[in-house]
Amino acid sequence: MLNKKIADMLNEQVNKELYSAYLYLDFANYYEDEGLDGFAHWYEIQAQEERDHALMLRRYLIDNGVRVTFGEIAKPDKEYKTHMCPLEAGLEHEKYVTSLIAAIYRAAFDEKDFKTMQFLDWFVKEQGEEEKNADDLIKKMKLFGGDSKGLYMLNQELNARVYTAPANAADRSEERRVGKECRSRWSPYH
């Protein structure tokens, strides 16, 4: 069983990750309206990743005997005046999420909850990647976005992005799907 403070913080993070997915779908809607389907596609994949993060946190809580409760998900309240606005808002949001993960990590350290710290190591690394990806996209937009041909090419590049589920989440899902009673002698899950 997890420490109550850590469990509460992780449970709240589930909700924050779901909000992130909601926010990125809002960005995708904006870009669809603007005729930038590649940008929309990129943020649809971002939304899927955030949902995956929520599910990973949820599973960790459940596996540690914690009842997961969901809070309200706030409606994104932004209007985007330029194509750059969602990109900048996305970077700021990723920095915010990084600070939330860091706070949970710090609390786990203070409580000597090494198991949770190890679990969160993946999220710490992931947040570094998320911030870099958001920053790189802003740099590309500044470089190419002012020119219609450049914007078209960037849109095409973003449209080629392929969704990849986190390896540890996929492995855990497969383990649950197969189930102990269904494993054969050749199963890698012995």
Region locations from a protein language model:
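Positively charged, low-complexity/disordered segments
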Residues: 179-190
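Iron-associated oxidoreductase/ferritin-like identity signal
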Residues: 1-177
